[in-house]
Design a protein with these regions (language model features):
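Donor-binding/catalytic cores of nucleotide-activated saccharide
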Residues: 1-75
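Noncatalytic linker/hinge segments flanking ATPase motor cores
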Residues: 6-7, 90-101, 152-158
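Sequence-pattern detector for short linear motifs
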Residues: 14, 107, 113, 171, ...
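Short charge-dense sequence patches
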Residues: 25-37, 80-84, 142, 171
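Alpha-helical scaffolds flanking conserved acidic
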Residues: 32, 100-109
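Residue-level recognition of short, structured coil/turn motifs
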Residues: 43, 92-96, 164
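Catalytic core of nucleotide-sugar-dependent glycosyltransferases
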Residues: 54-63, 69-98, 109-116, 122-142
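Membrane-interface aromatic/basic loop that binds lipid-linked glycans or pyrophosphate carriers
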Residues: 119-178
């Protein structure tokens, strides 16, 4: 799940596909969100999406871009989790045989968030952070039985479910020793 490049920078589509669906305003990782919507719309079947080979492009951001802000933790990690949850819900209703793969995708997005959130933001008043930790804890047993997660994935999941901030503090200390 989510292999390859989901960026619209490398896709060629018919413009009439955009009459019903639009990029979600203000969201990051919007390419993935829109691609999933387009590919699962039964009324507006996509005849094909051409991918430009070689992905040797450069992305330039506007000065006021919401994609990259070096002064704060990017919302893209939260939007990735929201998209993973959207995919899981879609898969559970339409493609139930892929549910455990979609669940794995959501675990990966949550672990990625936990690996990148600044330690200073891992606080009790950060509602999104708390929801990620709660989700990791609530889904722990399901993750341990998931055949698509490796032992390493399950180890990270367990550590972040038990003591997320402590693990990050320890990781930072070990990283600085090397």
């Amino acid at each position: 799940m989510h292999r390859g490049d989901c960026s619209f920078c490398t896709k060629l589509l018919q413009k009439d596909l955009f009459t019903k669906e639009k990029f979600p305003v203000g969201a990051l990782n919007e390419d993935f969100h829109l691609l999933v919507k387009l590919l699962t719309d039964e009324e507006n079947i996509v005849p094909g999406i051409a991918c430009i080979p070689g992905q040797t492009y450069h992305v330039f951001y506007r000065p006021d871009s919401n994609t990259r802000d070096k002064n704060r933790f990017s919302r893209v990690f939260a939007d990735n989790i929201d998209n993973a949850d959207m995919v899981l819900q879609l898969v559970e209703t339409r493609y139930p045989e892929l549910t455990e793969i979609a669940f794995r995708f959501g675990v990966f997005q949550r672990l990625d968030y936990m690996l990148h959130i600044p330690i200073a933001q891992m606080t009790g008043d950060n509602a999104f952070y708390r929801s990620v930790v709660k989700s990791l804890r609530k889904g722990w047993w399901r993750a341990m039985r998931n055949p698509y997660l490796t032992k390493k994935n399950k180890c990270y999941h367990t550590l972040f479910a038990i003591a997320p901030k402590g693990i990050r503090v320890l990781h930072r200390k070990v990283k600085h020793l090397q």
